[in-house]
Swiss-Prot record:
Keyword terms, alphabetized: Decarboxylase, Lyase, Magnesium, Metal-binding, Polyamine biosynthesis, Pyridoxal phosphate, Spermidine biosynthesis
Cofactor(s) demanded: Mg(2+); pyridoxal 5'-phosphate
The protein, known as: Biosynthetic arginine decarboxylase
UniProt keyword annotation of Magnesium present: yes
Function: Catalyzes the biosynthesis of agmatine from arginine.
Length: 635
């Protein structure tokens, strides 16, 4: 058999396809991160994590690679610049980052700084996001788009921000909202910069397709759009409308759905121009997807188009329709948040242990002393001894039937616990023996295709699924998961990944594999005293802000890293994860009050001589230490 290589590992984890040339495996068998596609520079993730642990930064650790963030902004801007040139498009392109995708200050701040040379803007959908965007725009002069529902206070804030020099466009989502805007504008004497969101009949595809179509939550129907134009005319505010916006969903997997939306949206733009609305911008919303599984398909965790194809189709379709309608081409805006930030962050954590059975030495006597066994276990031993490739299916089915029979006999009191343990042990031996034969069969019979799942072990990892990758639990989103080390060795254990929450939903059983979605993740047998790390990739979009505090596991440690040619990497920022007291404070517990209550109770017990002073003092020290410690597991 040929020696396992890093190329074999790259294939089974499909790294070359989902990695966007930002992730690879080096000669040591460790995962590497690159600042940009095809860059000769890289950071060894295993070395980086070891260095962070030496700095007392414990896993789980969220690694944010700021160069990747800058590179994604540059890539999106570049492909649109090329598409504009190739199609002789007479207007400009501008990207806006929807901060709902990842509102962390350091992330938005980095995007604001990186985006200056690309004229990037910020999109917001709430009052807190508006305030955050205004703070980031201060000194940077970033344009801001306001989507979502708005009350009078929101509208007043936008209008006065406009008065004092901020470039803010307020997008009308509903007719009643426009009425409020008109009222506030007249009352304050401030003319707003307006956009209108239209509700397309065209829909996206996948889990977010309901963002488009006739039943979409946001936007004006065509009849309402005409009514809005009439209202603006009556109030001498039609010239305030500079932007038309539509959005048909996030993570659009098929390019034809994007084309359909572009055609319908641009036709509406053209008709509005003919009605005398001097629109300057066409905001095509989000939808630019990420190929999470590397299949380049229309599956919901992938996309069947490239970044270049997306940009070319946007520019071509808009220009073609505008030329046909005889109207000026608009400046184009997109809100591609997911595609901007998904790749830049990686969660790395340690595997704690697995659920492999510990085999006691005396179990081996089952095979040599069958006369002492119950009839059910004796039948299982006979199956084990007689298995061959000609009887695999029958032996497998008989084994399952007999193990179920052993449970029934145990429940009825005819089988004791030791005999049931014997049945479980010999069953596991049979399954492994069958698997050793199945692995050598080509092709594998249909009935045995999923057989290996019965061998899947659960590896317990030091993280909270609900905190760090909630979409995996909530909507069955696929994220690439790869061991960051030993990739020059064959991973010979099929696994599922369980977190450390007390919830059976905290387990991942669908993974990115060589041929798309797979039900088991190949990992290595963990060596004695080995720190074995796995990485969760492409988690930069939505996961941090959607994460919740199930079991009060809080934010993880986060580290901002940039590439450095001299020292390989530079740590820019370390953000400590939540301590126990911080998680408790989130649910209204005060750490000092906790200590006070416990201390008072202990003093009573000391006075009654139930505990000693030393025991009381030691427990208080432990409790205080726990309050100050990381919510995740240590040694």
């Amino acid at each position: 058999m040929a020696k396992w290589t890093i190329n074999d590992s790259s294939k089974i984890y499909n790294i070359d396809n989902w990695g966007a040339e930002l992730f690879s495996i080096n000669k040591k068998g460790n995962v590497c991160v690159h600042p940009s596609p095809n860059s000769k520079y890289s950071i060894d993730l295993k070395v980086l994590v070891d260095d962070l642990i030496k700095r007392k930064i414990k896993p789980p650790i969220l690694l944010r690679f700021m160069n990747i963030l800058e590179g994604r902004i540059a890539s999106i801007s570049r492909v649109f610049k090329n598409a504009i040139s190739d199609n002789n498009y007479p207007a400009k392109y501008q990207t806006f980052y929807p901060i709902k995708v990842n509102q962390q200050r350091q992330v938005v701040e980095a995007i604001a700084n990186f985006g200056k040379k690309y004229n990037i803007g910020l999109e917001v959908g709430s009052k807190p996001e508006l305030v955050a965007a205004i703070s980031m725009s201060t000194g940077n002069n970033l344009p801001i788009l306001c989507n979502g529902y708005k009350d009078t206070e929101f509208i007043e804030t936008v209008l006065f921000a406009t008065r004092v020099g901020y470039d803010i466009t307020i997008v009308v989502e509903k007719l009643f909202e426009l009425e409020k805007i008109v009222e506030v504008s007249k009352r304050t004497g401030i003319v707003p910069k307006l956009g209108i969101r239209v509700k397309l009949s065209s829909k996206g595809i996948g889990k977010w397709s309901t963002s488009g179509g006739d039943d979409a939550k946001f936007g004006l129907r065509i009849s309402e759009l005409i009514a809005a134009i009439d209202m603006l005319k009556q109030n001498d505010m039609l010239d305030s409308v500079k932007l038309l916006h539509f959005h048909v969903g996030s993570q659009i997997t098929k390019i034809d759905k994007i084309k359909n939306a572009l055609i319908e949206g641009t036709r509406i733009y053209a008709e509005m121009r003919k009605l005398g609305v001097n629109l300057e911008f066409l905001d095509i919303g989000g939808g630019l997807g990420v190929d999470y599984d590397g299949s380049k398909s229309s599956y919901f965790s992938s996309v069947n188009y490239s970044l270049e194809e997306y940009a070319n189709d946007v520019i071509y379709q808009v220009k073609n329709i505008c030329d046909d309608a005889g109207v000026p081409c608009p400046n184009i805006i997109s809100e591609s948040g997911r595609a901007t930030v998904a790749h830049y962050s990686v969660l790395v954590t340690d595997v704690l242990n697995n659920n492999t059975q510990t085999l006691m030495p005396d179990f081996e006597s089952i095979l040599t002393e069958p006369e002492k066994l119950s009839p059910t276990v004796k039948k299982l031993v006979d199956i084990y001894k007689s298995i061959d490739k000609h009887s695999l299916r029958e032996d497998y089915h008989d084994t399952i039937q007999l193990i179920q029979e052993s449970v029934s006999l145990f429940n009825l009191g005819y089988l004791n616990m030791a005999e049931r343990a014997n049945a479980e042990w010999i069953c596991s031996k049979i399954i492994r023996k069958i698997n050793s034969i199945v692995e050598k069969m080509k092709p594998i019979p249909d009935e045995l295709q999923n057989f290996q799942l019965s061998l899947r072990q659960t590896y317990f990892a030091n993280f909270s699924l609900f905190q760090s990758i909630p979409d995996s639990w909530a909507i069955d989103q696929l994220f690439p998961i790869v061991p960051i080390q030993r990739l020059d060795e064959k991973p010979d254990v099929l696994t599922s990944i369980a977190d450390i929450t007390c919830d059976s939903d905290g387990e991942i059983t669908s993974f990115v594999g060589e041929n798309g979605r797979t039900k088991a993740l190949p990992l290595h047998k963990i060596k004695v005293d080995e720190q074995y790390y796995i990485g969760f990739f492409l988690i930069g979009a939505y996961q941090e802000i959607l994460g919740d505090m199930h079991n009060l596991f809080g934010d993880t440690n986060a580290v901002h890293i940039t590439f450095n040619k001299k020292t390989n990497y530079k740590i820019d920022t370390v953000i400590s994860g939540d301590a126990t007291w911080e998680s408790l404070k989130y649910v209204q517990y005060d750490s000092q009050e906790i200590l006070k209550r416990v201390r008072n109770n202990l003093e009573k017990d000391v006075s009654l001589q139930k505990v000693s002073i030393e025991e009381s003092s030691h427990f208080l020290e432990l409790l205080d230490k726990t309050l100050q410690s990381y919510t995740y597991l240590g040694e």
